[in-house]
Amino acid sequence: MAASVEDEFEDAPDVEPLEPTLKNIIEQKSLKWIFVGGKGGVGKTTCSCSLAVQLAAVRESVLIISTDPAHNISDAFDQKFSKVPTKVKGYDNLFAMEIDPSLGVAELPDEFFEEDNMLSMGKKMMQEAMSAFPGIDEAMSYAEVMRLVKGMNFSVVVFDTAPTGHTLRLLNFPTIVERGLGRLMQIKNQISPFISQMCNMLGLGDMNADQLASKLEETLPVIRSVSEQFKDPEQTTFICVCIAEFLSLYETERLIQELAKCRIDTHNIIVNQLVFPDNERPCKMCEARHKIQSKYLDQMEDLYEDFHIVKLPLLPHEVRGADKVNTFSKQLLEPYSPPKK
């Protein structure tokens, strides 16, 4: 006699929840690109800097890039960073840089462009050409950053991303650039006189649309390579950071669905700023907050049972400076336990 559905469920083994840490990320040596993102104000920067610190302990060289115009990694490490990789104080193999992709190619340092006469004007001409295609200027700035980063051969790159909308544009930049360059190729003959005129006005000599197209096409192999790597779970993953509130949970679910559409791997969620009750010093506000957070935590554990869900506490102090980031980072590897009273 066939077993009933109820019997099958009774016989099925309980599914053990995945370890609530980021050890799986630290131990996956094949990872090249790690994105950390989520809604604004949830502690993405603290988490991404902490992850970079832990990676620096086991990887040869680590770069953390902020693509958030707020540039909070300078605040987190209490050290000023710029558009080029700079060594984090106290570390030999951890570097940081900050870019503002919304400024497009104008944001890139001159070091990104070659020195010879034809290409030294690349920055000015790319700004002029890209302005005709909405979105591609930002995408090209990502592309140039990727070209630089790949040339430096960092073991792993951590992205401290801007809030969700910017992040999705970052992940889609290869498609945007290829589409934009395709349109540029189609109209290059029409804009050739404009390009020549601009070069003469800038005192850069003769340059035609074919030369500009050639300059831009040099970036395409890097873009295609990065695009393939982004879609390879062995090389790329995305860590979602949120807090245990409705809007943050909603944004996280939307982000995970968009990542799936982009074929970007994600299997880790950090739930930050959790309040734990203090029996010795009861606080009605804290208890109410804990109750609300517990409700959303339960929902997350049901919804994301195939994710590593890391729980981090709300702290009574700021995490600022390399030492505090280092201390905080240890909680990514060991499940947090509230102090026993």
Curated annotation (Swiss-Prot):
Its main location: cytoplasm. Its EC number is 3.6.4.-. Changing residue 68 to N: No effect on interaction with GET4. Reduces tail-anchored protein delivery. Disruption phenotype: GET3-deficient embryos have impaired swim bladder inflation and reduced body size. From day 5 post-fertilization, the mutants display abnormal cardiac contractions and decreased blood flow velocity in the dorsal aorta and cardinal vein. Mutant hearts also have irregular shape and thin walls. Gene3D superfamilies: P-loop containing nucleotide triphosphate hydrolases (3.40.50.300). Keywords: ATP-binding, Cytoplasm, Endoplasmic reticulum, Hydrolase, Metal-binding, Nucleotide-binding, Nucleus, Phosphoprotein, Transport, Zinc. The modification Phosphoserine is found at residue 4. The keyword Cytoplasm applies. InterPro entries: Anion-transp_ATPase-like_dom, ATPase_ArsA/GET3, ATPase_ArsA/GET3_euk, P-loop_NTPase. Zn(2+) binds at residues 283, 286. The active site is at residue 68. It is an enzyme of class 3 (hydrolase). It is found in: Cytoplasm; Endoplasmic reticulum; Nucleus, Nucleolus. This is ATPase GET3. The gene is get3.
